[in-house]
Amino acid sequence: MHRTTRIKITELNPHLMCVLCGGYFIDATTIIECLHSFCKTCIVRYLETSKYCPICDVQVHKTRPLLNIRSDKTLQDIVYKLVPGLFKNEMKRRRDFYAAHPSADAANGSNEDRGEVADEDKRIITDDEIISLSIEFFDQNRLDRKVNKDKEKSKEEVNDKRYLRCPAAMTVMHLRKFLRSKMDIPNTFQIDVMYEEEPLKDYYTLMDIAYIYTWRRNGPLPLKYRVRPTCKRMKISHQRDGLTNAGELESDSGSDKANSPAGGIPSTSSCLPSPSTPVQSPHPQFPHISSTMNGTSNSPSGNHQSSFANRPRKSSVNGSSATSSG
């Protein structure tokens, strides 16, 4: 598995900052012709004197450029979630502005325009925020009972859950170490922190978990843990040593066979016929033909002669053929 690469916020700044004011996007607005984004107040003020994009010089509109710009809520949410404290500071600035200028018309604006939206309502989580979470043991039997719509809860099940308050920047690895030290779990066992039935990565922070699984703040962040034996793995060096020893044993056995009197004789145990199997001739198709060398014929064994005693046999002696009977 490949670990997710974590990059610095400064590497993303070119995609999160407005080229007109040099700050992070506030009320991000995108030109639909070229998809370049700017702060709303920055691009509106710029288009009062120009009808072209500040970045690529594409014509926004011939006469009414404000018709071809759109508010980009998705991009703005990304900026608020990536830049720590930006949303909270912006809401404070808006509240201070309307407090200093009571005559400003904010009645038609939304709560966010007036700075009256809290981080909890916007689901924005900062690194220094304290998150409430619950941790309990993952019991497969209890899960099966839940699937079977068994709604009865015993006192033991309720007491298994523990509640913690942790910084949003706390990682799953820190939570695993806390559980190991709190419950004295030996190193021969592995602890998995889970959300529902899915194990979590060690480098996930509580803020990452809240964003990934869309935690709504309607209760503590529900986490579970399980304990299982650590899988033992044989070291590669041990495996290589075993293979080397096996090779040496095979070579030793081969040399012993070569030095033994029967070392050069191939094994024929698998080729021996059984008592019920008839003996086959070297020429199974023509058993009556025998080979001749230098005028002498090679006769078969005594047992073989008896089986073919009554059959005529041809042989050639010094170029002349003769027929003899047994």
From Swiss-Prot:
Residues 279-309 have a biased composition (Polar residues). GO terms for molecular function: promoter-specific chromatin binding; RING-like zinc finger domain binding; ubiquitin-protein transferase activator activity; zinc ion binding. Residues 164-228 are annotated as: Interaction with E4F1. Coiled coil: none annotated. Keywords: Chromatin regulator, Cytoplasm, Metal-binding, Nucleus, Proto-oncogene, Repressor, Transcription, Transcription regulation, Ubl conjugation, Zinc, Zinc-finger. Changing D77E: Increases stimulation of RNF2 ubiquitin ligase activity. This is Polycomb complex protein BMI-1.
